[in-house]
Regions:
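C-terminal structural segments of small proteins and small subunits
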Residues: 66-87, 91-93
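Short S/T/G/P-rich N-terminal loop/turn motif that feeds into the first structured element of a domain
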Residues: 1-55, 64-70, 97-137
Length: 137
């Protein structure tokens, strides 16, 4: 199982606009439940902490495999959500990780191979050819 977690801040010059944007984001992503093969679980949480360094919203998803996450990135329903949200989302952070504890796979070194200079371990910066850095949202 692969977990895909994305956090954002949303645009909005005032509290009412930000609240509308958060509600739209939550509704759009929740509309993906049951529509994407291999997407096992989806949650959208809006921050309640009120701390100034928190992100506004988190998307927590579980996929049956890495291949399912890759397919999700190009699935028509996911692409529809991306279009619907436009540039509403800012300050994006992402982490993808194997939750099965696959033996022999080191999540830091990607099975023992050294990361190229500047590579992102957390998956924040997409990296061509590296499945852990797939840009999905």
């Amino acid at each position: 199982m692969l977990k895909h977690i994305v956090m954002w801040n949303v645009r909005g010059d005032d509290d009412a606009t930000r609240a509308r944007n958060l509600a739209l984001l939550k509704a759009e992503f929740e509309s993906l439940r049951g529509r994407v093969p291999g997407l096992l679980h989806l949650e959208v949480g809006v921050d309640e902490s009120g701390v100034d360094y928190a992100c506004d919203v988190v998307l927590y998803t579980e996929f049956e495999s890495r291949e399912a996450l890759v397919a999700y990135a190009e699935h028509p329903e996911h692409l529809r959500v991306k279009r619907a949200l436009g540039d509403l989302r800012i300050a994006r952070h992402q982490v993808d990780y194997d939750a099965t504890g696959t033996p022999g796979r080191d999540p830091i070194t990607r099975a023992g191979a050294a990361h190229p200079a500047g590579a992102s371990v957390a998956g924040i910066h997409p990296h061509e050819g590296d499945i852990d850095h797939v840009q999905t949202l």
